[in-house]
């Protein structure tokens, strides 16, 4: 159900309308969803860089002799179609060139091997060219050895374990598959607590190439302390955020994270742990969270007769796998199972307004792609399928009988990060949406408002079972450490899938079943060595679709603000 306006005392007295009570003030499910967005994700996609520095073959020494080329003979080729090689060499046919130009033809064949995922040295051997046919010699590279260096001293991640990340997917003495080598290096470099650089070198035997890996530890821990005003007004706007991550504490690529977000009336904690289960990138993780909240200020009892308190508990398992790793693109697969318990109580007498749990199965794909179009940019996207089941507890067995107990929902996101002026101006366009099979509980709904959504409205504003949102932002570098932003946000939400349910609850919001929130704004961000400051202000566009019986637009924080200011200061360590 969407966020409602504060109505008259008559509406406040309608305690039998459970959905209305939940709509007036964000409950445990709505609060938890907003807080989760502020916790850093440890499953984000990497920004890959060229993983292997390839040695350039020695060029033939220039001479005075020129050669008229009538054809090429390529010796030693086993892995690339001959037709593809001859097509690559076609630009040199019929030309009279100096001898050093022949090495450029050889380099073109080596590049063709790279395109086929192979590594080869292509040279122009000493020869007497009498009939215009040039001989090129191909030496297809085999992996001779994987040598591990530790320039900074012994690593917490063992030498043998690091070597296995390479050799499990790239057998020694076999022809090198460059995509396999690159993938192995990316996965090793993404392992928490591990940093590697690599170099291909000539091997001991002809045709062999050795991979030298420099292995070093990253910091054993990292984190941040943050202050912001991102909280819900019903539980306290000002928040203190602490996040600490321990990389590789067990010396086998594991990761342990703790987060806490505290305001005047809420305390949210989350812990997660993950570890690799093979050398191909599979990771298994567990996570748990706990939220305790009570309404404060004008939302507290006895000022508000619908004031409440409650909690949310979650525990879950997750599995992730890097489907694709390459210099230009990445794809991740995730799967998970969650159990979430919610309880909301009335502050006046302590009776339950809701008591239930949600059991979810989740599958997801996410990816990004790097390109050089118009100065370069990044495309990112994700899709998530959630199948869930609601089990009502004993505290309030009649909780919201209008909400179906099984559901399916899809969440999608797309974004483009485009350099308009390199290193100065960046344009970001992002879109997200949710599609549901039935009406959803507050913990599973789509929300438009808040600092991560339509910034002209408060968090948890614009709730619905289905919705979509677009955010457009321009970032302009003003000086070394300061960035200015200008943005436009817009979102569409459908409160109810069931039209009969909408008609029954229409009076709680006076809004159409589907409505739009939109706004514009500007901001500043300064990044010093360890401290990041940011502030933005957003103004709503158009009238507020949620309004009182008197026609006054009002948000779920009991305000009629035409603008919202968001501020954040963050210290990283």
Which residues are covered by each model-predicted region?
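Periplasmic polypeptide-binding modules associated with outer-membrane biogenesis and secretion
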Residues: 24-231, 259-268, 430-433
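Transmembrane beta-strand segments that form the barrel wall of outer-membrane beta-barrel proteins
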Residues: 222-231, 242, 246, 252-263, ...
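Transmembrane beta-strands of outer-membrane beta-barrel proteins
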Residues: 223-225, 254-258, 282-286, 331-335, ...
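Hydrophobic, lipid-facing positions within transmembrane beta-strands of outer-membrane proteins
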Residues: 240-244, 267-271, 313-317, 359-365, ...
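Outer-membrane beta-barrel "beta-signal"
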Residues: 244, 524-532, 557-573
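Outer-membrane beta-barrel proteins
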Residues: 246-250, 272-279, 292, 318-326, ...
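C-terminal outer-membrane beta-barrel translocator/porin domains of Gram-negative envelope proteins
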Residues: 345-509
